[in-house]
Amino acid sequence: MPTDGKLLDSSETHEVVHPASAPSRFSAVETILLAQGRRLFSWLSVGWAIGALLYFFPPYEPGWRLAALIFGIGAALLATTWSRLRFRALAFTLLTLSGGFLDAELSAHRLPPMPALPSRAVILHAHINRIDILPPRHGETPGRRLILQNAVFETGIDIGMPPLRRLLRVRLREDDTTPLQAGQEIRLRALFRQPSWPSLPGGRDPQREAWFANIAGNGYALGPATALSPPTRQSLEKLREHVAVTISQTLSGQRAAIAATLLAGESSGIDPRTRQDFAASGLAHLLAVAGLHLGLVMAFVIVFLRAALAAWPYAALRWPCREIAALGGFGIGIDYVLLTGAHLPAVRSLGMAALATLALMTGRHVLSMRSLALIGLAILIVAPASVLDISFQMSFAAVMALIAGYEALRERLLDLRGEGGFLRLLISHITALALTSLLAGAATLPVSVAHFGNLQPWFVLANLLAVPLAAIWVMPSGVCALLLMPFHLAAPFLILMGWGIGVIITLAHAVAMLPYAENPVPAMPGWGLTLYLLALCVLCLWKGPPRLFALAPMALALIAPWLAAKPIVLVSPDAGLMAVRDQNHLELGPFGSLEDETRDEWVKALALPISSLLAHPGCTETACPVEHNGRKILLRLRDRQDGRLLPSEEACRHAVLFVSASPAHGACPGAAVIDRFSVWRDGAYAVFATRQGLNLVSDRSTRGARLWVPKIGSHGMPNLPLAQEE
């Protein structure tokens, strides 16, 4: 039995100490900790994530002093009580929780403040940081969105000012065909706005996302872009374009579009119907290059190289074939990530692949909880806000479930493989692929439901078929095609890849047509998602039968969407859209295209079909009375008089709440009021019914005074000149 001093050592070979056999000198807590062995190391990243999450909870900007004090106490406790196991575990708990909190606070405060953006159309020049290809809208041609850095506005007050320290996102016009590449300096006329307020209290927070993404605002071009300098990075773009052109010369339609996505990161050719089918069937992840694709590419290359080296007697006897294959697979993986655009999920997966390659080179376990914890801890230290990111949550939930699942089923899988005959090998590999889809899909389904508000019950069936097809047919053919393109021999493998893609497209369409393929689910409250992820960590990381107790909080988290209170009235951040919820519908007032995103967020949050509020008896744009449990609410949906014409005394009689798209100007005395000035100050509103009356909840009251929440009346920090040197 190893000594307790090795509790948080990185070694995995650890004899489990059962409570019955633990020495009497250990307390009950120490006995439990000893039984976990070195698996406790994996909890360091969990503690860091919880600490980072604690920074985002308060409705105010928390100070750093208390967390720093706790960190100091943890460090002192670790230094003075290292020989006592329970105190050492407590010290690491304090260190990780406070460390994650301090890291998140430092990450938030080191970013530049939100700048004030011009309120009118402006000409600017900037450098292109990145170009995103956007899917077509309503059958139009694919769009382009530029991520601009070092932007300088050509306005009177901005002359001589330093460039913006944050990035700008701007969508180009559909008819702008100017060839642009990352690194170029451009001149452009555009209209910008700051990051949007949340569409409803407690909903998705675009302002927080923009703060940590270093984004200053979004805009759209009013004219064509003019290139002021040649591109500085051409080789990858040209190579990506060459791959896409070669694919289009061999394949056609959606097969060519998906092949270009998988091999060159060019997703603009995928039409809305295909995207909808893949989303409804739970296969949308196949259209976004990430860890799955990288893993399939590297696995194919490693298996091929190792088999080829083993078939050569000289190499098999003298060379480290496994290590050579691992390095070759990792090298191809790097090339693949760069070729497909180096998107953040793929880059994150490449870091995990680097650790897996290192494990192969040193004879360690390729996938272990320790390596997953190290990668997670590294990502959280660099970007603690990742704890709120869906890609981070889904990636680590999936990998953690895979490692735990394969650990639990290892003996049965070995029995299935037997002596290694061809048929048994084939069955074991297919079973492993199916098990991978099942474990990863089951672990990430609640996370997907929490973020997207959609339950796809047939996703398991679709992934059980599609992922093995992608692993043994589509991606190997694609890798062979890429390697043979310089020799003009890629066509046969592209055709083979196209056949496999065609099968997956047919499968996605068939599953999307099944009954109940898509089921809207109400928004999961934050505590529900947090509870689920913590319960999943306990289920996967804890050793022994007590981990099954995590199933109870996990079940509670899964029903959380139906336990949370639902608003009866919603008001958008600009009061341009209002909605009333009844039992079966979300009744919407009149709105324009600018409110489409808000409408979609409301529908996703409440999981109800929409209908027109104007169809309500006695409802007009200027006076729309509705009742809820005997309480009268008066809505003014539109007002061309800008509030100058007050509602009649009859309309206001017995009203307990007056909601107006224009200034209320003292209308309906005695009633609570939400008007245009209310949302200007506090953002979107949600009205909840309680036994005592109506509870008015604003976005500002929910988020509080945080760095990314604009102060009342604030338009951002003016772009001031730098101080002159002495």
Regions found by a protein language model. Name each.
Residues 2-38, 94-285, 663-726:
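Membrane-interface helix/helix-cap signal primarily in integral membrane proteins
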Residues 22-88, 528-536:
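Membrane-targeting alpha-helical segments
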Residues 64-73, 394-395, 463-469, 526:
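Alpha-helical transmembrane segments of polytopic membrane proteins
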Residues 176-178, 182-185, 189, 209, ...:
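Non-globular, low-confidence helical/coil segments that flank catalytic cores
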Residues 2-58, 359-360, 479-498, 502-503:
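Hydrophobic alpha-helical segments
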Residues 73-74, 81-89, 93, 219, ...:
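Hydrophobic alpha-helical transmembrane segments in multi-pass membrane proteins
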Residues 51, 126, 190, 262, ...:
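Divalent metal-coordination and catalytic microenvironments
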Residues 163-164, 225-234, 276, 280, ...:
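Membrane-interface amphipathic/re-entrant loop segments adjacent to transmembrane helices
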